[in-house]
Amino acid sequence: MDKYKKLIGNSFVFAIGNLGSKLVQFILVPLYSYTLTTKEFGQADLLTQLVFLLTPLVSLELFDGVFRFALDELPENKPQLISSVVGVLSVSSIVCLIIGGVTDTIFSNFEPLLTSGFLVANIWFALISNYARATGYVKVFAIAGILNTLIMGLTSFVLLSVFRQGVQGYLIAFIVGLCGAVVYILAATRMYKQISFKYFNSAKLLELVKYSAPLVPNYFAWWLNSSSDRVFILTMIGSAANGIYAMANKIPNFINLIAQIFSQSWQISVVEEIKNDKSDQFITTVFEVFCGVLFLAGILIVTWIRPLFKLLINHNYFLGWKLTFIMVLAVIYGSVSIILETVYTASKETMIVFKTTLYGAILNVLLTVALIPLVGYYGAAIANTISFAVVVLLRLRGIIKRGLLKVNYRKLATYHVVYFLAAALPFLLKNDVVVIAFGLCICIVIMITDKNMLNISRKLILHKELK
């Protein structure tokens, strides 16, 4: 199967899985709003964020290590890989549940035991699903994502609407959904046949830890780079400004969803191709097309943003549309940095990933503190954009030095110029229809003149080999 077709095919499968899950989550919002008080939902959301924050720390990001190593491990060695991690995570899971049980007797209002159960279930789902994805069970991985949210949704309905279990029901639903998805993956892939403590290999485990350990602080640095702006706006300006800022970021996050879906298939493809003599051609082509797609999406968003705010968003947040063009650029840079990160993880150079993320996070905090007093929440958006741009430049420099990527600087500069022209249209023209028409014309011209986009699209349609 041609590498480009495989990349796009996997992306399509992951898109179905991700969008299906997002749809179920969207449908659940009214259920939560009618069955949980604002206090209960606030507590439930806080516990959920805590679980997602603790998952990399408690697991040492070993599920990412399993994914990377399983992609190029010989079939006879894969049982050692998965069994070694299962052994370690079994111990850490037991410790988590014991701690949760003990603290539950003291702080029962915060549901420590159920939160620990949610954390353990989330870790095991991450491990089992990533191993399935790495060993070729892409469709099983996608179905498991949908199944997880479906089971969680049905359980939420029963526990919240029928039995009125509140926060406890909310957490139990997550646990049941994750466990159901894990059971499905184990059954569909027969992975359980590869798991045995007799395959435990301490040397293999140490190799995994060396790879995964830098990804733990990287996760927290990335979180700081992405979320610290909200904290500073809240403390330095106020909750109203933070609300406008948060709302302005909702629509640009659509680009982030595109990047997340694509990165799931890109991780597989880049590991398979990086040892190839012509890997630089593949990485360069994908990088150029991906950047083009991101800027196309960005241009559409900034030219549609004003009418979208008028139609979909409460008038109290209307000023947020003026922030969007900066936030879209930040999301584009953040998405590009994720794709570049994958090239480093494919080469098992995770320490560089951590260092570049850390530099961006430090710069983001310093710029945010300096700019907010000068230009308000625009300063936070500008700081976010600059910090992600620096991360991209640092990662690009390293990848270019390794001969894995050739950057068409003229094309990237053109994308930026065209983007800023499109972003200026809503500020210069009052007629939304005219702005949208200009935006569509710009996108059509880019698609027609971009040779890589045209080549990949034409060959895929004609089912020809891509070169």
What spans do the regions from the language model cover?
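Interhelical loop/hinge segments that connect adjacent transmembrane helices in multipass membrane
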Residues: 1-3, 139, 167, 171-173, ...
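Signature of the first transmembrane helix
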Residues: 3-63, 97, 149-153, 157, ...
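Alpha-helical transmembrane segments of multi-pass membrane transporters/permeases
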Residues: 11-21, 79-80, 116-122, 132-157, ...
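Specific pore-lining/lateral-gate transmembrane helices of multi-pass inner-membrane transport
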Residues: 70-87, 244-357
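Hydrophobic alpha-helical transmembrane segments
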Residues: 113, 143-191, 359-363, 377-398, ...
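Membrane-proximal transmembrane or re-entrant/amphipathic helices at the cytosolic face
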Residues: 426-467
